[in-house]
Amino acid sequence: MDTLDKLTILADAAKFDAACTSSGVDRDPQAGKVGMASAAGCCHSFTPDGRCITLLKVLLSNACCYDCAYCVNRSSAQTKRATFTPQELAELTVDFYKKNYIEGLFLSSGVIGSPDHTTELMIECLSYLRNELLFNGYVHAKVIPGTDPDLIDAIGRLADRLSVNLELPSSTSLTKLCPHKNAETVTKPMSFIHRLRVSEERQLLEAKNASKGIVKSAGKPKGIVIPTQKQIIKEGLALRSNCLKNTFMRSSRVSSNKRSFSPAGQSTQIIIGASPESDNQILHLSQALYQQFELKRVFFSAYIPVIEDHRLPELDTPVPLRREHRLYQADWLMRYYAFSPDELVSPEAPWLDLEIDPKLGWALAHLNQFPVEIMDAPLEILLRVPGIGPTGARRIIAARRRSRLTFDDLKRLGIQLKRSHHFLTCCGVRDASAPLDQELIKQRVIADAKASSYNKTRRRIESSQLRLF
């Protein structure tokens, strides 16, 4: 079997893995080396200048000794198997880079014999790629649960980001669908990666302080960053586009390009719809993972029924793509807007509303906190208004220093008034066309969304495009 035949099989086998966007690494080009990592990201991500860049998403092998019920590569599956040699895959990656097909590599694998043996092969591939072929581009590597810590350390020195897939939202479902795995084997490498990153950060900070003659630095604990009013005004005047650094995101005291071990951190993936857990359980799990292991991302992957198994949903079960989308929106609110899971879901209402986004759902459930006066609302309150994002909120704060704002002014600032005008007053004046009833607001927002040019275009494309699976 030649290399391209293997690629056809192993790229297709990797398509169900969602946790492969890049990441926060901004490594400059180096003399004599091939490629560079961009903080803007790859794997069909868009850079600030509009470029779309991709990575090669592939398995080292789809042979696997595990028999996870949901996996197309499980040991009992009747599928064509293939395995790259480490050198073969490394050379293919550089060849694709030189042809401008990709700017990075996402590397995973089925379990060949044991987690340690598989990881050793992945390390051999990445070592050849980095040290012999001098590839300097972005690399995301999967850590297989049960891998020896020394091997995790080694692969973390070669990859920009590591990920350990949690796969299922509860230990009960993991035991039922993945007989070779348990929650401890998944969380143990997560904890090890976290400890190594914290240790390296501490060493880098101590070295930095020592170079400045500082004996000891108290430092500020990590957490939600609440900018000062002066910072907000300055940013509001300067902002021209949406920028993640201006949200309530967690701060890092060490730049990624200073780190040697997994500089872009770690992520995980949770499969949605293969097991009965609610959105309430999933979002609380996500919050715990962010807090305990400082994950950069929790990815959600809507389960696609392609395997007939009594433990899984029927083959004709719809793929829960909208639920996946709502979970991503809720996750975004938790990571960047300082929402907690308890504000979005609860044991009494454990499912996100599929018709409206979670931020609007929260606002409709808390109408007693609205309308918000645009001239004096603080940043954290403005960010809770549907239709106002971090850039818009800072523009409002900067603009209201100069003049009294009207709804026309908000429109010029780029605020989505179709959503936000229901929840705002400008100098004490409410938009007369905005209803005060919860259900009327919901139906109007849904109607506006259906009539949007984006959704019209999407429906037209979906009706004319052949689905791959």
Where are these regions (language model features)?
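Short, charged beta->alpha transition segments
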Residues: K57-V58, Q87-K98
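Conserved AdoMet/S-adenosylmethionine-binding subsite of the radical SAM
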Residues: A90, G113-Y337, E343
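Flexible, acidic/Gly-rich N-terminal and inter-domain linker regions that tether
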Residues: M1-A63, Q416, L424, A432-R460, ...
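Residue-level signature of tetratricopeptide-repeat
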Residues: A399-R400
